[in-house]
Amino acid sequence: MANLKAIRDRIKSVRNTRKITEAMRLVAAAKVRRAQEQVLSTRPFADRLAQVLAGLQQRLQFENVDLPLLQRREVKTVALLVVSGDRGLCGGYNSNVIRRAEQRARELSAQGLDYKFVIVGRKAGQYFQRREQPIEATYSGLEQIPTAQEANDIADELLSLFLSGTVDRVELVYTKFLSLVASNPVVQTLLPLDPQGLASSDDEIFRLTTRGGSFTVEREKLTSEVAPLPRDMIFEQDPAQILSALLPLYLSNQLLRALQEAAASELAARMTAMNSASDNANALVGQLTLVYNKARQAAITQELLEVVAGAEALNG
């Protein structure tokens, strides 16, 4: 009987765990929807900013303008901005982006370049601190759905490092959202800004929907028709000054989009991990129930045999 009680307790424990994992899956799904809405809400601003930058570039294309954020210089030190999460229970999300950052650091070292880390997320921060890697700044405790203010704070740190000459290039290592079951850690250059890519407005958005009782993601390619600025538009300030002021804003916007995509990847990974955990819990409950029924049947059979044996002994 003691064995039966232990199995019952184990079944109860697994069922309680399943309730937790299922709740976490639903919470992650709700936050993915919120992240989707936030991405869509920032698109009009991003499109208008791209329009203004494209117009200013066209006005200044034949002028010799000194814009530090566009200048490429000899690279000696690279800042690696690594975007990870603060929490676990999200499959291989954190380990994959950390592995990609380590790989990029080795590539830079092989080229004879120094590197510094700027870390977003507690998991990557703890990992690189334990290995005594050069960390310039760490950001943790961010909202699960990143805000513009958080992106601005990180962008200010990167601008300070780049403009002061502490680093000559800033690279971003983050997880690109592909689907609920697939993501890809990628590396892209943030600074210096690419003048050819300032007006790029093509984008992909994702929509979390339900189909057949399960969650699925629909991707949509958006192409914004950015109209050129009127040729007779008069700027009160010098166009070069306006462009110089807007470039940091463009950097913050690009960083915000990357943070949002990384957050969507983390939430999707957590959804997948919790869904797998719930499925495993269901399977384990089934196995334990089968073991319990067999043990209970064996106990009943044993009791019947004992009763029969006792009756035969009395009759004999």
Curated annotation (Swiss-Prot):
* Record key words, sorted: ATP synthesis, CF(1), Hydrogen ion transport, Ion transport, Membrane, Thylakoid, Transport
Q: Which domain of life does the protein's organism represent?
A: Bacteria
Q: How does it assemble?
A: F-type ATPases have 2 components, CF(1) - the catalytic core - and CF(0) - the membrane proton channel. CF(1) has five subunits: alpha(3), beta(3), gamma(1), delta(1), epsilon(1). CF(0) has three main subunits: a, b and c.
Q: Does the keyword Disulfide bond apply?
A: no
Q: Where in the cell is it found?
A: Cellular thylakoid membrane
One Pfam family matching this protein? ATP-synt
Topological category with respect to the lipid bilayer: Peripheral membrane protein
Organism of origin: Synechococcus elongatus (strain ATCC 33912 / PCC 7942 / FACHB-805) (Anacystis nidulans R2)
User: InterPro entries, per this entry?
Assistant: ATP_synth_F1_ATPase_gsu, ATP_synth_F1_gsu, ATP_synth_F1_gsu_CS
Q: Does the keyword Transport apply?
A: yes
Quote a single Gene Ontology cellular component term.
Answer: proton-transporting ATP synthase complex
Q: Name the chain's protein.
A: ATP synthase gamma chain
* Chain's role: Produces ATP from ADP in the presence of a proton gradient across the membrane. The gamma chain is believed to be important in regulating ATPase activity and the flow of protons through the CF(0) complex.
The entry assigns this protein to a family as follows:
Belongs to the ATPase gamma chain family.
CDD domains in UniProt: F1-ATPase_gamma (cd12151)
Gene Ontology molecular function = ATP binding; proton-transporting ATP synthase activity, rotational mechanism
